[in-house]
Amino acid sequence: SAPAFFDPELIRRFDVPGPRYTSYPTADRFLTALSSPEVADHLSRRANGPEQRPLSLYVHIPFCNTICFYCACNKIITKDRTVSERYLAYLEREMDAVLAALGTGRLVSQMHWGGGTPTFLQAAEISRLMAAIRTRFSLQEGGEYSIEIDPRKV
């Protein structure tokens, strides 16, 4: 086979530190300065706007059993399994609040579970969360669905 060819100029051009990819959209696209009325207004405009595009959901499960020293994610390191029960109840309340503005049964074409480590949840808790999502949203067949896992726990 032919020897590999590397363009030295191309290597010099891209041999610089770049942004660390962690998620899409990236964290700088999220706003923390929105008030509850502003969020409600945004959701209302989304629900009643001319385009009824499918939704994309991000479900954040912040818990991890141990810290990964390379990780820059928003996380809570704990061995206390009881924290997830209360957190799931809050996720269900948040879904209900969002759907109060959007309406139930909205089509979801993309969903990602991130963390933390979503597989911190026990099997029954994962089932509970999926059931909560399925009763509130309509998951598009053939949609894009993903979950971050700790391979040591699967």
Explain the meaning of each model-derived region.
Residues T82-E92, P151-V154:
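Glycine-rich anion/phosphate-binding loops
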Residues L55-V59, S109-M111, G143-I149:
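Hydrophobic faces of well-ordered beta-strands that scaffold small-molecule active sites
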Residues C64, L91, W113, I147:
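Conserved, mostly hydrophobic/aromatic
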Residues P54-L88:
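Canonical Radical SAM [4Fe-4S] cluster-binding loop centered on the CxxxCxxC motif
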Residues P50-R53, G103-L107, S138-G142:
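Short helix-terminating capping/connector loops at secondary-structure junctions
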Residues S1-L55:
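Flexible, acidic/Gly-rich N-terminal and inter-domain linker regions that tether
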Residues L99-R136, I149-V154:
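Conserved glycine-rich "GG(E/T)P / GGGxP" loop and the immediately following alpha-helix
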Residues L91-A101:
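A short, N-terminal amphipathic alpha-helix
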